[in-house]
Curated annotation (Swiss-Prot):
<comment type="pathway">
    <text>Carbohydrate metabolism; galactose metabolism.</text>
</comment>
<keyword id="KW-0119">Carbohydrate metabolism</keyword>
<dbReference type="InterPro" id="IPR000705">
    <property type="entry name" value="Galactokinase"/>
</dbReference>
<keyword id="KW-0808">Transferase</keyword>
<feature type="binding site">
    <location>
        <position position="224"/>
    </location>
    <ligand>
        <name>substrate</name>
    </ligand>
</feature>
<keyword id="KW-0067">ATP-binding</keyword>
<feature type="binding site">
    <location>
        <begin position="124"/>
        <end position="130"/>
    </location>
    <ligand>
        <name>ATP</name>
    </ligand>
</feature>
<dbReference type="InterPro" id="IPR019741">
    <property type="entry name" value="Galactokinase_CS"/>
</dbReference>
<keyword id="KW-0479">Metal-binding</keyword>
<dbReference type="InterPro" id="IPR006203">
    <property type="entry name" value="GHMP_knse_ATP-bd_CS"/>
</dbReference>
<keyword id="KW-0418">Kinase</keyword>
<comment type="function">
    <text>Catalyzes the transfer of the gamma-phosphate of ATP to D-galactose to form alpha-D-galactose-1-phosphate (Gal-1-P).</text>
</comment>
<keyword id="KW-0547">Nucleotide-binding</keyword>
<dbReference type="InterPro" id="IPR019539">
    <property type="entry name" value="GalKase_N"/>
</dbReference>
<dbReference type="InterPro" id="IPR020568">
    <property type="entry name" value="Ribosomal_Su5_D2-typ_SF"/>
</dbReference>
<dbReference type="GO" id="GO:0000287">
    <property type="term" value="F:magnesium ion binding"/>
</dbReference>
<feature type="binding site">
    <location>
        <position position="67"/>
    </location>
    <ligand>
        <name>ATP</name>
    </ligand>
</feature>
Length: 389
């Protein structure tokens, strides 16, 4: 595939010399949802599909960007001296935001580059196509301009780009998983301290199956920011009653039970309940995984979905239909929505002998309930972003 992309790059940019190649994965979160911005634990892994880039450094200050996923937009061009959010630049605002964030932190970027992107992550599926292109851009900048910057710092700058430049209040999980991914491992990440641990995911005769609702959704204008605000308000209420925390993720379920009566707003209470219980589920689930107890891990995935449905209310008809159909299937170890919600994807662990029937039956039931066709992917856990030799 890379050979074809190089060929396309040379045709589009009318160039015949040497080029650089990079890859950045998508990610799926196995458990610990909407906990990252609540200072809690998440458990994502990088996928073996993602975003590819073919790049050539330029002598001037122009950036020329082309995406095989948005060919109708042609080459999007902007200048190093004028890095502002521009709606007409569409997807290219993501790399642009990363470049600006690097410059704002005084990293020396003195010229532009030509780049061809191609992603085989479905856009809007909640598998972090945006974090993938952000971290990919950071890796390109480090390599082309020989920058002295470590991957964790790059990940943080990508989150800043998404928060400040794009305007989505996302936590650090997506960029961290994309940048720090490790083959056959998921990452237990404490989003408050950024302490992390690689945990091998040993699925014997089982697969991770991702199902895409194919429901259109926009993260920036969805109810994502509302949920975050509710949790922040709950923290304020607790602090006014001398609980003294920065994030809900600092409370155990037992501690929360003792103080939750202070939160009188019903909606805030439900949101806070999810944040605290999901954080505990993530920690317990990882302990089961370390003992190779996939059955218990799966049960906690199911409980996670129920909490996201009932307390956090971020699922909706499409995600619930996929998950409930999955729960009815023989061979399903666990199934839940993954990502921000309101559409996007589910993640399931399914016994290999039943994967074909799972895809067929869940797809059929989903179409009957929603009128939409779901897409299914068997996910392999891959490495984080880097240069391709």
């Amino acid at each position: 595939m890379l050979e074809n992309l190089i060929k396309d790059f040379k045709e589009i940019f009318k160039y015949s010399g040497e080029v650089e190649r990079f890859f950045s994965p998508g990610r799926v979160n196995l458990i610990g949802e909407h906990t990252d911005y609540n200072g809690g634990f998440v458990f994502p892994c990088a996928l073996d599909f993602g975003t590819y880039a073919v790049v050539k450094k330029r002598e001037d200050k122009t950036f020329k960007m082309y995406s095989k996923n948005f060919e109708n937009l042609g080459i999007i061009e902007f200048n190093l001296d004028n890095l502002i959010y521009d709606k007409k630049d569409d997807w290219a605002n993501y790399p642009k935001g990363v470049i600006k964030t690097f410059l704002d932190r005084n990293y020396k970027i003195d010229s532009g580059f030509d780049v061809l992107f191609f992603g085989n992550i479905p856009n809007g599926a909640g598998l972090s196509s945006s974090a993938s292109i952000e971290v990919l851009t950071a890796v390109i900048l480090k390599d082309l301009f020989k920058l002295d910057v470590d991957i964790i710092e790059m990940v943080k700058m990508c989150q800043v780009a998404e928060n400040k430049f794009i305007g989505v209040n996302s936590g650090i999980m997506d960029q961290f998983a994309v940048g720090m991914g490790k083959k056959d491992n998921a990452i237990l990440l404490d989003c408050n301290t950024l302490k992390y641990e690689y945990v091998p995911v040993k699925l014997v005769n089982m697969s991770i199956v991702i199902a895409n609702t194919n429901k259109k959704r926009g993260l920036a204008d969805s109810k994502y920011n509302e949920r975050r605000t509710s949790c922040e308000e709950a923290v304020k209420v607790l602090n006014n009653n001398e609980v003294n925390i920065k994030y809900l993720g600092e409370l155990t379920v037992t501690e929360f039970e003792k103080v939750k009566h202070y939160i009188t707003d019903e909606e805030q209470l439900k949101r806070a309940t999810h944040a605290v219980t999901e954080n505990e589920r993530a920690k317990i689930a990882v302990e089961f995984l370390k003992k190779d107890d996939i059955a218990e891990f799966g049960k906690l995935m199911n409980k996670s979905h129920t909490s996201l449905r009932d307390d956090y209310e971020v699922t909706g008809l499409e995600l619930d239909s996929l998950v409930e159909a999955a729960w009815e299937e023989k061979g399903t170890v666990g199934s839940r929505m993954t990502g921000a919600g309101f559409g996007g994807c589910t993640v399931s662990i399914v016994e290999n002998d039943y994967v074909d029937s799972f895809i067929k039956n869940v797809g059929k039931k989903y179409k009957e309930k929603t009128g939409l066709e779901a897409s299914f992917y068997i996910a392999n856990i891959g490495d984080g972003a880097g240069k391709v030799k």
